[in-house]
């Protein structure tokens, strides 16, 4: 909340001060359309302004929340200016009337009220208490996690099913691939890919623990990664490609032994689907690459929800992702088309989801909103309907004890909000 002295200067606010006030009140989505507004422009905003661009494209509540905050700002300014009670024109003083015996009687009250005041009813409009702009809603996050987990389990089941259909490499040799024509296979390259992937997942998990709005952001991660693996189940099943290299040693086919298939599926789940853990020795899960999905998606989330000033951190994560994807191809463990399709679907789904989540108008189905035609739009509305605006890149210390600053030995609890 702004101080009373600052309230007196609202009309003199600079555009930067207006932007700071918007961020303090958790309304970062207005910073860009109101970027040139001064304090005077801010308090002159009306309902009509929200019916015209650009404000009509920012808010789905017709700017009601911002207008309520501006009304509160005006009232605090007014109350501060008249807090002593002598500038409102309602203070009147009684008159002492002498008695016939020369003494003075009690004061005659001009309005019949004690102390010379008159009673009036003043109606002050106050904004109604509002819910948090970024509610945690852990129940929805749990539902999104179960969705992602179900899609991951379904993917492992599908890998086991497709493995039974892969033709032997002696019968159906690898398909021609331009990358394989120009780069010889490097045996250890796939291990580098999986190590890079584990590093990126670890960095993202650590970053997630420090996020203030971790429930909302993890919900988005689970929704996107679950949908990507669901798509992967479909592409693997409809088209079974031969192994991409003669170096593959696929595990024997089980020919309907469901008990052995269940054990194989559980082993794959326990090992995280990684070859480096010895859990993945099945073939057929080529179109498209799950490793590329994780390398790309973790980088996108790390960059999206970390401060812009940490450019070096973004470059390190980008390098880990690119090297990992290149090593997939260098190991000849996926066709080039597997990697290209995985990258395309992952980036587009991430960008579509976040564009829709950051624009309130896109959360409402209409004839003009063509994005509302995607099959996952209803679940998206359910998960995102209570999130108002762009989620700030806010961080806080998650542990019960404060951080100790070593250079000054000062204890503090840190909260960073970098938008």
Swiss-Prot record:
Provide the positions where the record notes the PTM Phosphoserine: 14
List residues traversing the bilayer: 142-162, 190-210, 221-241, 282-302, 310-330
Q: What's its membrane topology?
A: Multi-pass membrane protein
Domain SAM: residue ranges: 13-76
Active-site annotation? 291, 334, 338
Q: Which Gene3D superfamilies match?
A: Transcription Factor, Ets-1
Q: Which residues lie on this side of the membrane: Cytoplasmic?
A: 331-419
User: Is DNA-binding found in the keyword set?
Assistant: no
The GO annotation for biological process reads: apoptotic process; cellular response to lipopolysaccharide; cellular response to tumor necrosis factor; ceramide biosynthetic process; positive regulation of gene expression; sphingomyelin biosynthetic process
Any idea which UniProt keywords this protein has?
Apoptosis, Golgi apparatus, Kinase, Lipid metabolism, Membrane, Phosphoprotein, Sphingolipid metabolism, Transferase, Transmembrane, Transmembrane helix
Matching Pfam families, A to Z? Answer: PAP2_C (PF14360)
Note whether Lipid metabolism occurs among the keywords: yes
UniProt function note: Major sphingomyelin synthase at the Golgi apparatus. Catalyzes the reversible transfer of phosphocholine moiety in sphingomyelin biosynthesis: in the forward reaction transfers phosphocholine head group of phosphatidylcholine (PC) on to ceramide (CER) to form ceramide phosphocholine (sphingomyelin, SM) and diacylglycerol (DAG) as by-product, and in the reverse reaction transfers phosphocholine from SM to DAG to form PC and CER. The direction of the reaction depends on the levels of CER and DAG in Golgi membranes.
Q: What is this protein called?
A: Phosphatidylcholine:ceramide cholinephosphotransferase 1
């Amino acid at each position: 909340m702004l101080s009373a002295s600052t309230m007196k200067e609202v009309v003199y606010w600079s555009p930067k001060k207006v932007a700071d006030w918007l961020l303090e009140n958790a309304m970062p989505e207005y910073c860009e359309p109101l970027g040139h507004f001064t304090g005077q422009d801010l308090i002159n905003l009306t309902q009509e302004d929200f019916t015209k661009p650009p404000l009509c494209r920012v808010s789905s509540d017709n700017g009601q929340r911002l207008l309520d905050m501006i009304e509160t700002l005006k009232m605090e300014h007014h109350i501060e200016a008249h807090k002593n009670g002598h500038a409102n024109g309602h203070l009147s003083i009684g008159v002492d009337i002498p008695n016939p015996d020369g003494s003075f009687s009690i004061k005659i009250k001009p309005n019949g009220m004690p102390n010379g005041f008159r009673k009036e009813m003043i109606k002050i409009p106050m904004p109604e208490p509002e819910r948090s702009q970024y509610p945690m809603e852990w129940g929805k996050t749990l539902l999104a996690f179960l969705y992602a987990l179900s899609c991951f389990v379904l993917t492992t089941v599908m890998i086991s099913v497709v493995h039974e259909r892969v033709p032997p490499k002696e019968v159906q040799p690898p398909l021609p691939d331009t990358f394989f024509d120009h780069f010889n296979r490097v045996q250890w390259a796939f291990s580098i890919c999986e190590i890079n992937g584990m590093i990126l997942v670890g960095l993202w998990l650590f970053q997630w623990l420090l996020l203030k709005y971790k429930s909302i952001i993890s919900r988005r991660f689970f929704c996107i990664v679950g949908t990507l693996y669901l798509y992967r189940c479909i592409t693997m099943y409809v088209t079974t490609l031969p192994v991409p290299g003669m170096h593959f040693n696929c595990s024997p086919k089980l020919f309907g032994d469901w008990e052995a298939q269940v054990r194989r599926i559980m082993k794959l789940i326990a090992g995280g689907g990684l070859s480096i853990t010895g859990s993945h020795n099945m073939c057929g899960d080529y179109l498209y690459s799950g490793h590329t999905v994780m390398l790309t998606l973790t980088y996108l989330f790390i960059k999206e929800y970390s401060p812009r000033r940490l450019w070096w951190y973004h470059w390190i994560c980008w390098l880990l992702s690119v090297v990992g994807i290149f090593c997939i191809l260098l190991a000849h463990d996926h066709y080039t088309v597997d990697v290209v399709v995985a990258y395309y679907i992952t980036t587009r789904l991430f960008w579509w989801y976040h564009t829709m989540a950051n624009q309130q108008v896109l959360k409402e189905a209409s004839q003009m909103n063509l994005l509302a035609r995607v099959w996952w739009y209803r679940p998206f509305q359910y998960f995102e309907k209570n999130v108002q605006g762009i989620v700030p890149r806010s961080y806080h210390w998650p542990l019960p004890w404060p951080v100790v600053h070593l250079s000054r030995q000062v204890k503090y609890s840190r909260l960073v909000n970098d938008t």
